[in-house]
Amino acid sequence: MEQLLAYEERLRQKIADVEAEKAQIVLQKRETRDKLANESLHPVERASLNELLAALIKAEELRDTLISRYREFMRYNRLMTEHNIRHHSHEE
């Protein structure tokens, strides 16, 4: 039981960490788009920024997936915790 609660706390921390990473990525995307708005960019620099933007978009999508999976694990963990509580209370 205590292990399940400790596991849930670790998941909460992982979600917070990934959300912080995602916030940084969103900021980098905004900065990259601002740079791309400059019409006087050299074509090589523009291509490089477009590649960076594509990578940032993919990184953000991966963080969203990770957050979603961690939340699924938390829901499952809660269900198991509730099940164990009910199971142990019936034994007593």
Predicted regions and their residues:
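Short acidic DE-rich linear segments
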Residues: M1-Q3, H83-E92
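Short, charge/polar-rich alpha-helical segments
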Residues: M1-V26
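Intrinsically disordered, low-complexity regulatory regions of eukaryotic regulatory proteins
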Residues: A6, E19, P43, S89-H90
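Intrinsically disordered, low-complexity regions enriched in serine, threonine, proline
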Residues: Y7-E9, L27-R30, P43, E60, ...
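Intrinsically disordered, low-complexity repeat segments enriched in small/polar residues
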Residues: D17, T32-K35, S68, M80
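Short E/K-rich amphipathic alpha-helical oligomerization segments
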Residues: A20-I57
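Amphipathic alpha-helical coiled-coil segments
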Residues: E21-K22, S48-M80
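Short, flexible coil/linker elements and helix-boundary hinge sites characteristic
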Residues: E39-S40, R78, N84, H88
